[in-house]
């Protein structure tokens, strides 16, 4: 089901750890939205982060020019790339009541809904860790998790985001990411 652009701006907040590709996946989704004729703002939260430290990135997508220049405090969509972060950070904080929570986990949507007390909206889970290890042989969770967010929101076509990934990563790396994206779209659970 596609996100409702009638309300104006769709806001994303991404969570992960430094070095996991939080900023990259945020940019890839933003570039895909731009390719489909939308306006975007994509920006990371910088601080003293280092590899392994919790990081966040933000994305706004709109059919009209965006004139908001602040951090995203009440996102429509929260995407968590690192499955261990849900134990130390309330990634659902500020999520709108009708929002979408997308998490890389081997748990089902109901378990995540209960853990974070999400009453309305949508909870989407995908085992991006397993997908990444089986497809790429490395812990690159960001693209499969992003694919689950695309499936959950319909904000852009899966083909558009896949094309952006292939453009950024030509050759074998891009091909493996494409397989991981396709698998995540099939395996993501919406509840």
Feature-to-residue mapping (PLM):
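Active-site cofactor/cluster-binding pocket
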Residues: 1-191
């Amino acid at each position: 089901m596609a996100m409702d652009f009638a309300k104006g701006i769709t806001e994303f907040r991404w969570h992960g750890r430094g070095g996991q590709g939080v900023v990259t996946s945020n940019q890839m989704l933003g570039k895909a939205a731009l390719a489909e004729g939308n306006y975007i703002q994509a920006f990371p939260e910088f601080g003293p982060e280092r590899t392994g430290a919790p990081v966040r990135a933000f994305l706004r997508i709109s059919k009209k020019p965006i004139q908001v220049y602040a951090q995203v405090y009440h996102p429509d969509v929260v995407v968590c790339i690192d499955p261990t972060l849900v134990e130390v950070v309330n990634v659902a904080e500020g999520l709108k009541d009708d929002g979408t929570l997308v998490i890389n986990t081997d748990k089902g949507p109901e378990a995540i809904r209960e853990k974070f007390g999400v009453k309305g909206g949508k909870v989407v889970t995908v085992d991006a860790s397993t997908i990444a290890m089986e497809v790429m042989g490395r812990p690159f969770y960001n693209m499969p998790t992003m694919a689950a967010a695309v499936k959950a929101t319909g904000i852009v076509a899966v083909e558009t985001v896949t094309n952006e990934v292939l453009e950024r990563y030509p050759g074998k790396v891009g091909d493996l990411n494409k397989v991981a994206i396709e698998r995540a779209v099939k395996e993501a659970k919406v509840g």
